[in-house]
C-alpha cells in the first residue's frame, strides 16, 4: 500500500460550457511581448495534443495499483474505469472554467484569475499551493529515476557501487539534473516531450500486450522469470476494500492535474474563443481518459494484487520489452524534471519576494539546494507515504476542483462571468466535492500511516 501512496501526487455536461446568451463569446486579450511582437499561437489540434501530453504523466503508471487497492478481482476494473472517466469529465469542466474566467476577467494566469475573481490579497496562497505540489512532483520523479535505474542496472555489468540507490541518484543529480535545471532556455528540451509521449505510448502498448499474451499467467514464460527473481506473482480475487477505495479516489483526484496551466492554453490558442478552447479541453482530456483506462485495466488484468505503485516494477527483469519501457520512461522523466523544477524555483522567488536582481544572485545556490533536496528525498524516502498522500491529495483536490469552481462562483457574483442556474449548482457541488475528496484523501493517508489500511 505505501507504494501506491508514492504516486498520488503524480491519478457536468459539455453543454454547460456553451456561453449563455447574456454574455458574448469573448476573446482573450493577448499582451504583446517586448518589441511589440505577439506571442506565437497554437492551433486547436496542436493545443489538444499538448494538453493530452501535459495530463498524461508518470502518475498514470500507478493506476493499476489503485484498482488493486480497491479489489484484486478482475471485475473491479470495470467500475474503476468508469470512475476514471467520470472524474476525467469533471476535471475537464474545471479546466475549462479557468479559461472562461480568464477570458471574462482579462487575466492570463491561474493566480491572476483568482486575484481578479476572488481575493487580490491571497494570490500568494495560490502560488504556494502550486509550488509545493510541483516540488512533490520533482521528488516523485527522483523516486521513479531511482526505481527504473535500479531495475535496469541490477543485471548490468557495472560496478556494484553504482547499483546502490544513494550513489546512483547522487551522481545522476549532480551530473544530469543540476545542469539541466540550470538551463536558461528550456526549448532545447523540446524533444523530451516527444520522447515522453512515445515512451508512454510504448509502455501502454507493452502493458496491453502482456495482458493479452498470457506470458505472466501461471505456467507462462515470464511468470517463471518472476519466481526466479523473487518477485510477486499475479494474484486475483479477494473482497472489496473501502479503505483502499479511499486511496484510489485520492489518486484520481490528482491524476488529471494540469489546471494551473489552463490559462496558458487559452492565452496561446490561435483565435481563442470559448468554443475552440472547449474543443481543446475536452479533446485533450478524452485522449487522457482513454490512455488512463487502457493502462489501468491492462496492468490490473496482468498482475492483480501484485500491481506495484509503479507498474513497471511488477514486470520481470527478464522482460526485454518492459526494460525498454523502463529506459524510455526514465529518460522522459529526467528530461521533464527541469521543466517542473523551473516552476519550483520561480515559485520560491515569488513567495520569498526576491527581487529580480537578487534572483540572479541566488539562482545557482537555490538550484543546488533544491536539486539536492529532491535527490536526498528520492534516496531516503523510496515511498513518499504520508507526505505525498496527505499533502498531495489535499493540494491536488484544491487545484483541480476547489480553486476553479471558487473562481467561477466569485466571478459570477461580481458580475464578471455569466453562469446559469445549472452551472451554479454544478460549481457549488464540485466545490464541496473537492473538500470531501481532500478529507477522504487525508484520512486515507493517516489510516495507512497507522497501518489501518
Outline where the language-model segments fall.
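Membrane-interface "cap" regions at the ends of multi-pass membrane proteins
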Residues: 21-76, 91-93
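The first (N-terminal) embedded transmembrane alpha-helix
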Residues: 44-62, 174, 253-258, 295, ...
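Central hydrophobic cores of alpha-helical transmembrane segments in multi-pass inner-membrane proteins
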Residues: 58, 88-97, 173-182
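Extracellular loop-to-transmembrane helix junctions
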Residues: 66-107
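Alpha-helical transmembrane segments of multi-pass membrane proteins, especially transporters
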Residues: 50, 80-84, 88, 130, ...
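Membrane-water interface regions at transmembrane-helix termini and the short interhelical loops
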Residues: 66-70, 154, 174-195, 268, ...
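N-terminal chloroplast transit peptides
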Residues: 1-23
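Membrane-interfacial loop- and helix-cap regions that link adjacent transmembrane helices
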Residues: 34-40, 45, 96, 102-127, ...
Amino acid at each position: 500500500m505505501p507504494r501506491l501512496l508514492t504516486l498520488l501526487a503524480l491519478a457536468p455536461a459539455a453543454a454547460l460550457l456553451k456561453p449563455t446568451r447574456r454574455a458574448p463569446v469573448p476573446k482573450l486579450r493577448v499582451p504583446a511581448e517586448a518589441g511589440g511582437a505577439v506571442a506565437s499561437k497554437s492551433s486547436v489540434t496542436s493545443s489538444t495534443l499538448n494538453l493530452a501530453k501535459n495530463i498524461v504523466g508518470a502518475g498514470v503508471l500507478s493506476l493499476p495499483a489503485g484498482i488493486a487497492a480497491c479489489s484484486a478481482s478482475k471485475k473491479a476494473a470495470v467500475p474503476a474505469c468508469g470512475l476514471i472517466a467520470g472524474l476525467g469529465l469533471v476535471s475537464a469542466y474545471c479546466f475549462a472554467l479557468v479559461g472562461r474566467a480568464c477570458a471574462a476577467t482579462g487575466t492570463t494566469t491561474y493566480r491572476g484569475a483568482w486575484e481578479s475573481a476572488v481575493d487580490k490579497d491571497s494570490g500568494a496562497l495560490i502560488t504556494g499551493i502550486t509550488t509545493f505540489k510541483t516540488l512533490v512532483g520533482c521528488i516523485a520523479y527522483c523516486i521513479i529515476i531511482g526505481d527504473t535505474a535500479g531495475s535496469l542496472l541490477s543485471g548490468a555489468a557495472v560496478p556494484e557501487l553504482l547499483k546502490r540507490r544513494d550513489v546512483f541518484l547522487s551522481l545522476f543529480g549532480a551530473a544530469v539534473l543540476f545542469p539541466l535545471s540550470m538551463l536558461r532556455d528550456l526549448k532545447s528540451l523540446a524533444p523530451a516531450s516527444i520522447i515522453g509521449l512515445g515512451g508512454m505510448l510504448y509502455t501502454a502498448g507493452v502493458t496491453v500486450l502482456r495482458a493479452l499474451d498470457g506470458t505472466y499467467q501461471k505456467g507462462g514464460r515470464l511468470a517463471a522469470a518472476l519466481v526466479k527473481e523473487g518477485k510477486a506473482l499475479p494474484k486475483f480475487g479477494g473482497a472489496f476494500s473501502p479503505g483502499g477505495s479511499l486511496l484510489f479516489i485520492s489518486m484520481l483526484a490528482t491524476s488529471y492535474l494540469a489546471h494551473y496551466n489552463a490559462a496558458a492554453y487559452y492565452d496561446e490558442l490561435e483565435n481563442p474563443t470559448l468554443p475552440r478552447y472547449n474543443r481543446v479541453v475536452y479533446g485533450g482530456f478524452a485522449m487522457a481518459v482513454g490512455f488512463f483506462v487502457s493502462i489501468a485495466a491492462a496492468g490490473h488484468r496482468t498482475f492483480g494484487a501484485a500491481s506495484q505503485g509503479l507498474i513497471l516494477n511488477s514486470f520481470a527483469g527478464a522482460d526485454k520489452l518492459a526494460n525498454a519501457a523502463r529506459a524510455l520512461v526514465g529518460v522522459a522523466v529526467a528530461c521533464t524534471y527541469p521543466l517542473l523544477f523551473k516552476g519550483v524555483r520561480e515559485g520560491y522567488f515569488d513567495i520569498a519576494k526576491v527581487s529580480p536582481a537578487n534572483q540572479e544572485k541566488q539562482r545557482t545556490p537555490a538550484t543546488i539546494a533544491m536539486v539536492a533536496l529532491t535527490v536526498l528525498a528520492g534516496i531516503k524516502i523510496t515511498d513518499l507515504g504520508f507526505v505525498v498522500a496527505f499533502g498531495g491529495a489535499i493540494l491536488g483536490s484544491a487545484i483541480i476542483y476547489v480553486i476553479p469552481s471558487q473562481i467561477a462562483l466569485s466571478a459570477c457574483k461580481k458580475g464578471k462571468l455569466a453562469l446559469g442556474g445549472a452551472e451554479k449548482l454544478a460549481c457549488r457541488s464540485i466545490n464541496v466535492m473537492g473538500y470531501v475528496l481532500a478529507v477522504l484523501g487525508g484520512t486515507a493517508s493517516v489510516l495507512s500511516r497507522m497501518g489501518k489500511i
